[in-house]
Amino acid sequence: MYIHERDNWTSFRWDTANLTAILEEVNRKQGMLYGRLSSLGFDSKVKAMAENITYDIVYSSEIEGIRLNMDEVRSSVARKLGIENVKCTAPSHYVDSVVAVMLEAVGNYNLQLTKEKLCAWQAAFFPAGFSDGCKIETGQYRTNEEHIVSGMFGRERIHYIAPWPERIESEMNKFIDWFNHDESCSSVIRSAIAHLWFVSIHPFEDGNGRLARILSDIILARGDKSEFRFYNISSQINKDKNHYYNILEKTQHGDGDITEWISWYASTLSLALDEAETTVSTILNKSMFWQKASSIALNQRQTDMLNLFLDGYEAKITSKTWASLAKCSKDTAIRDIQDLIR
């Protein structure tokens, strides 16, 4: 029996006592992260958010087996946020559409969710109306049965069968009403529930996983009361996709007790916050370095190369390496390096 076949299936239950420790850990890390971010200037915050959103978009797509060009996504995000001096890689129309969805969603986290908005976001993921070469329904709830399967043709394994199409409208009305109005538990728990609930309805023919993660981000943004997003769960899920799909399948075959799902979700979020802390530390160190070096006259090549090292480049630098990275002659590279040493 699948979870949606049970009576009152969305009356989810969880053991608060078993979740207290991990939820407190997540709350503490959220507080520490935003505390450190308070010392960053506005421009640095925007750049940090741009990098986080880039990773979120790329890895959320990769979870579904869709590979996006990181430089294209980064360039599109930077342009839409008004960030200058970013390596320009012309993004495709598709990448621009996906980036626009994410920025609209988290930038307007306090606005009401609607069916029309969800349908528009899903359509943006499939501008040509195809997925894996097959024509699909876009911009509307699905009208066909949906089976989640894996394996080779003839040896498929069914992991989950979503609710019948006739139920989707009423199921989604209930979900959207809950999403817009329920504040009975913490934002972390609501974020975990939103993810599970949405993918269990599976309202669209494709794109449900990515939409579920966007909806989770919106609830976290509401909890943080900030459109600035500095951490994302997609990067961590992508590192262990098998665990993600296993815990999701187990919960969708369960009896409505989602304690294990929330625990996994919060633990994954905790790891995401650790990664964000590392990113913010890099940005803070970089900011402090340039404050101290503000009186030193540097050419653009030197500035670019120093930024490269401040961003974590660890290879030993030689005049040959410098010339290659800075796209200059070896003699020019030698002068640049000697000038910095002096």
Provide a role label for each language-model segment.
Residues M1-R342:
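FIC/Doc superfamily catalytic core
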